[in-house]
Amino acid sequence: RKAYYYLNKWRKSSDRKPLLLRGARQVGKSHVVRRTGAQFSNMVEVNFEQRPEVRKIFSGDLSPRVLIPALSAYFNAELTPGKSLLFLDEIQECPEAIKSLRYFYEECPALHVIGAGSLLEF
């Protein structure tokens, strides 16, 4: 329950940064994000473990002005800052996606972005 509370608080915050959830496998990280995603107009879920080909999108320019249209086209879903959630699941499988979080914060802070993964080391 605490996770839902904090994610909801994060969702409503005007001074929001991309969120990175770390934890052991099978503890409910993805579930809590999907449940939070229901509060948005839409959610694009990128699972780097199930769809490794998506890593190619993150192999070049990591700017949101490039990534947002590419992900929208690939998943056939609109990513609208302030209305959409971009969920980068199993993010440890794509180190470039982890790097992209910085650019989402700097260049497109209105887009809600959550990364989740296990075995993340910093």
Regions found by a protein language model. Give the residues of each.
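Phosphate-binding site recognition
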Residues: 1-122
